[in-house]
Amino acid sequence: MFNLGDLIIGKPDNGYSYTCGGTICKVVKKWGENYIGVICVKSDNPFIQRTECSLPEDEKMVFEVWSSRFEFFKSGKKNNKTWI
């Protein structure tokens, strides 16, 4: 899982489209069971075109954190979370 302050590039998996898809995002907060808060920017400069959005954790998504690729997913009920 990524941490606060990480810059991520969101990429939809299996055609699922979400707010931050294809933009560079900075993780700014986490809350609840279902959402992670991020800042999405349209350029490498974090002061340009900032917007806030949220990513649903219960959809499988692929992120690229600079050169490292990883997937995460949430499966089953609230007490049965699996992260890869």
Feature roles, as predicted:
Residues 42-84:
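Intrinsically disordered, low-complexity, charged/polar segments
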Residues 12-57:
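Basic/aromatic-rich interaction segments and small domains that mediate binding to polyanionic partners
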